[in-house]
Amino acid sequence: MNKILFHAFCVMGCLSLLTACEKGDITNDIDTHSVKVLEANTSFDALGGTDSIYVEGNVTHAYANASWAKTQTKGNLVTVTTEPNRDLQSRHTTVVIKTSDVDSTVIAIDQLGPYTQLDMPGTIVLDDEAGSVSYKVVSTFGIKVSSSDSWITPKYEHGALTITTAKNDEGHLRRGEFTIESEAGKQKVKVVQVNFDKDLKGKYYLQIDETDKNNKQVTTLYNASLEKKGDAYVLKVGNSGVEVPVIYDADNVGLSIASGQAAGKFKQYYIGTVVGASESKLSLSPSNLISGEFNYSEEVTKKVADLDGTVLTFGKPAMLILGAFDSPQFSNDSYKAFYLMGTNVYLYRLKPTTASAKSFDQPTFKLK
């Protein structure tokens, strides 16, 4: 859970907006010139309001040096009233108080900017069934919420933001968004409806750009299958028993592949993963990852009828190698060849009724 903290939209975590001053910026220094101040309450929140200053002696005249602050006097009392502050920053001015033509004092007046705080993730993930989730909102002036996606209904009332989603009967994951609006502007929040077993698990084409024996780049399709094994996830590649461990990111609905992971055996070789954000960043370190998020593309279904439209890409420069090692301890010395190697890796989910193509066949189409 990431805290989204706005000071007129001051944000920490997934969302990124503008910053206003903290309460620590407030000062109330009093510059006295012969008039003794008995009591002064001169710090205001963004809503504004009225507070009091008491001095020794009757006040003959008092005024504020900013249009957003007004003064009234009665005896030794000066009341200061501030208007609501809808600016991004806190603001400061002074009030001058006189008890005679020569006796006066100057008092600092400070007012905070708007404040809104939400504790919520940057991406909200809900199941395919109809449901809702609520988050507490602390806000000076409140927020406005809206969504152009018919299946997402955001609502703000009584200090809470509630997001309600309709049942997902589309047969695939779906992504949408809603907008939060406050004094600082607008911020979009992602919403995903997905069920791993229904929408992501199953058969895929793994598409990858490889270099053939003639040193020409070719786009190849491999049969693949995304499955859950206990608490772990694997991507089976081909029909030779190779199972690539993958990390399922439930918070963003994506996959990562780490380097140095054992993926089974092929003939006498141990298969291990080597990945990098680009060829120059390849490493056997398990901290080296390539990652991508699942999306739905209707264009893909129009292009290839066998596909259900669910797509994930690890990025065009990202490189995936399933290396063949002569030892289960993966190293440069034990690396002998590769089972698979290329860039621009995609996963395309097949419809459940689609029969698998022969493993390692050259594709008759290109999807990218």
Task: Label each region the model flagged.
Residues M1-F9:
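Bacterial N-terminal signal peptides that target proteins for export
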Residues Q193-K368:
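Ser/Thr/Gly/Pro-rich, low-complexity flexible regions
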Residues V35-N41, L47-T81, S132-I163:
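Surface-exposed binding patches on compact interaction domains or structured appendages
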Residues Q89-D101, G171-A184:
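A short beta-strand micro-motif common to beta-rich folds, especially ectodomain repeats
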Residues G24-E56, T105, L112-V138:
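Predominantly extracytoplasmic/ectodomain segments of secreted and cell-surface proteins
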Residues E83-L88, A166-H172:
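Short, surface-exposed loop/turn segments at beta-strand-coil junctions that are enriched for proline
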Residues C10-S43, S100-V102, A108, A357-K368:
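Bacterial Sec-dependent N-terminal signal peptides
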Residues Q111-D119, Q193-L200:
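Extracellular interdomain linker/stem segments of modular secreted and single-pass surface proteins
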